């Protein structure tokens, strides 16, 4: 586990990451209306379009005719986490274990549309990309994501899958 400043290599991999087309609102056993403080007209599932645009993750959520966008500026440092979870998985032809990996980002969030009412000063985001791979990080390693939004008027969590990353040549 280490805090790192994203270098050009990590930024290049981040630019290749694409969010899947669906985001689920985590509600536990509560109804969406109760579990999503600060989210106007919450739903269990949203359509989603998201990627790194400039120096911010831009995620646009849609539910029917309603939409909202979350802008998550890249922090100066991110947390890179990798662990051997001793499940015996290895990559064919390689002796080392396949690691469980996370990239974690935290910062202040900005929101529009159905997010706007709950996003006030100092509202925070916590974004996690999850996956498996060797000790070298690539966009292909990450398959799932989780996003928590917390603040004075907001408290909700989304999760979902990542789409296949953009090929390296398409990203330039």
Predicted regions, residues:
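Cysteine-centric segments in proteins
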Residues: 1-172
């Amino acid at each position: 586990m280490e805090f790192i400043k994203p270098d050009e290599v990590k930024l290049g991999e981040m630019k290749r990451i694409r969010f899947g087309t669906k985001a689920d609102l985590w509600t536990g056993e509560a109804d969406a209306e109760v579990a999503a403080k600060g989210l106007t007209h919450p739903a269990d599932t949203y359509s989603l379009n998201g990627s790194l645009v400039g120096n911010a993750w831009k995620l646009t959520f849609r539910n029917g005719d309603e939409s909202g966008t979350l802008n998550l500026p890249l922090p100066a440092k991110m947390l890179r986490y990798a662990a051997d979870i001793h499940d015996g998985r290895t990559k064919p032809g390689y002796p080392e274990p396949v690691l469980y990996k996370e990239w974690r980002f935290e910062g202040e969030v900005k929101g529009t549309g159905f997010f706007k009412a709950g996003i006030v000063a100092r509202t925070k985001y916590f974004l996690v990309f999850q996956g498996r791979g060797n000790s070298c990080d690539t966009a292909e390693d990450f398959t799932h994501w989780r996003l928590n939004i917390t603040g004075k008027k907001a408290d909700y969590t989304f999760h979902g899958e990542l789409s296949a990353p953009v090929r390296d040549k398409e990203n330039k």
